[in-house]
């Protein structure tokens, strides 16, 4: 058993933070949450900057942070990149890119959708759905390995390995649409995203995105390590940054 193997490794090297962290992952998968928290905390005692342990402890203990650590997101998706499409599309019946693409086309009507920025493009699943309807398609993502998979699809005019807020803060923005599928669930606090698009984009663009829905107020870090967002939270951002909400709906997006 994996847990026993980690314990043996720790008996030889008690300050092996990675073993504690990996043991936490295994215990969490087994549903032994209290033991998982204990293992993660031991990893943090040795390695305080352990992004995975820090984020998961927050998630399992009900502490909502503003955003997931960059290193956590990068490590998660770099490790997941090669099997991402197979796992999501075929096994989990992942529908978000198709839903977002269909919604965008319905809102836009006839003619080209112009220039689109795919925020957190991953392997390019949204790009495959939307490319034929726009004149320019760019993508950004934190995971280098996910971007390598996206390049193989050959649908993006430009791809950048960069954080969303960093890109929105520093790059020239001239887009008709900003789209994001299953990405804000790792961002949490969305104020900067809404503000930067509103204040820095050269044209009047639209933002189309998915979140995991919660009936609670605000946004919350769930035990899954993902953030959920309420409709009232999104409405408050629209009001604060002068957006108009054209559409809101809930739907089953994938098996879990």
Question: Whereabouts are the PLM-identified features?
Answer:
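Short, glycine-/aromatic-enriched active-site segment of Class I SAM-dependent methyltransferases
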Residues: 209-227
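A short glycine-rich, Lys/Arg-flanked "PGG" loop and its adjoining helix->strand segment in the class I
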Residues: 191-206
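Conserved alpha-helical positions within TPR/SEL1-like repeat arrays
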Residues: 18-28, 55
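A conserved beta-strand element that flanks and buttresses the S-adenosyl-L-methionine
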Residues: 179
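Class I SAM-dependent methyltransferase SAM/SAH-binding core
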Residues: 117, 123-167
